[in-house]
């Protein structure tokens, strides 16, 4: 269900020729048909969320095609022109290097980088936001970047919730409870849901849910009897907060609305939204 202000609406893309119109329409249809409530203050916030999700998906595919390597933190490496490898295996932005340039380099020169899956997901999030922000704004928000697992910049606002419906652009986690300790890096896989039943995970590539589970099961202890599985944990960029920094020159998605109800009372507690 999609709520704009106090109105429950069924949105649709009015310009079928705009970039990624079909993908955006699919996302809108999924959100409108889900039981989960997606609440926005304005139509511009919804437009930002749509563009953000599309850019998360395209950034995931760009990273997949960049040559970016899968490595444990002990074996991680980065381009020393822009980053310093920390003692824990993270990537620390060098002084006087604009974070926008350094993030873009990961996608241009992926073979010069290697790390594990959680860091890759945060890199994708940064790249998606860079596509929607002015470089000056991005560099101000994310100065002194450190890329290391979930130790992301405090100005990157994320929402993690348990339960809810899956939407393209969501980050979800596959867990492998009986992983072989010799390959502990395969205890799970962070992935971006691309839509159409496909996921991107750094290390497994673009695969279906069943294929990712199969890949993780191959890395269990001998005689394991518990299968890997897709958890119900969903992580998203908080598009309502991050939309404040959007570039005014970013094209807005043309969205029309079929009104369903205009007297909804919306209450949000934590990450759970209820409509009365």
Swiss-Prot record:
One of its GO terms (molecular function) is protein-glutamine gamma-glutamyltransferase activity. It comes from the Bacteria. NCBIfam families: PRK03187.1. One of its GO terms (biological process) is sporulation resulting in formation of a cellular spore. Keywords: Acyltransferase, Sporulation, Transferase. InterPro entries: Gln_gamma-glutamylTfrase_bac. This is Protein-glutamine gamma-glutamyltransferase. It holds the Pfam family TGL. Probably plays a role in the assembly of the spore coat proteins by catalyzing epsilon-(gamma-glutamyl)lysine cross-links. Belongs to the bacillus TGase family. Its EC number is 2.3.2.13. It catalyses: L-glutaminyl-[protein] + L-lysyl-[protein] = [protein]-L-lysyl-N(6)-5-L-glutamyl-[protein] + NH4(+). Signal peptide: none annotated.
